[in-house]
Amino acid sequence: MQIAVCDDEKVYLDCLSRKIKACFKEFEIEISLDKYLNAVSFLEQHNQNPYDIVFLDILMPEMNGLDVANRIRNLSEKTIIIFITTENHLVYESFDYR
């Protein structure tokens, strides 16, 4: 299973990546996890080889996570998108992306 985590805050990126790895390990599921500090580098890779699951920060410079989700959906309906945010008001906007 190919997983990507995209967050512009390195501390959150590393912490979430560790937790994701631990959860999948607990259920004995092998994963490959890539980390990205910006949406542009993530999209370059995702466009070449789409991920199965993407953990995506909503608030990022250059391109926000909601715009990235639109680009993911244009490429693949199968990719599971899980939004990450500390802003409660953005949670409801993320419901429009399936």
Which role fits each region the language model picked out?
Residues 1-2:
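Non-catalytic signal-transmission and effector/linker regions of two-component phosphorelay proteins
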Residues 5, 31, 43, 57:
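Generic anion/oxyanion-binding catalytic loop in active/binding sites
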Residues 6-7, 36, 54:
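Conserved sequence signature across two-component system core domains
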Residues 7-9, 86:
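Acidic di-acidic motifs
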Residues 10-34:
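Two-component/phosphorelay signaling modules centered on CheY-like receiver
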Residues 22-26, 48, 74:
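Secondary-structure boundary motif
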Residues 35-41, 65:
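Helix N-cap/capping motif at the beta->alpha junctions
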Residues 44, 50-98:
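CheY-like receiver
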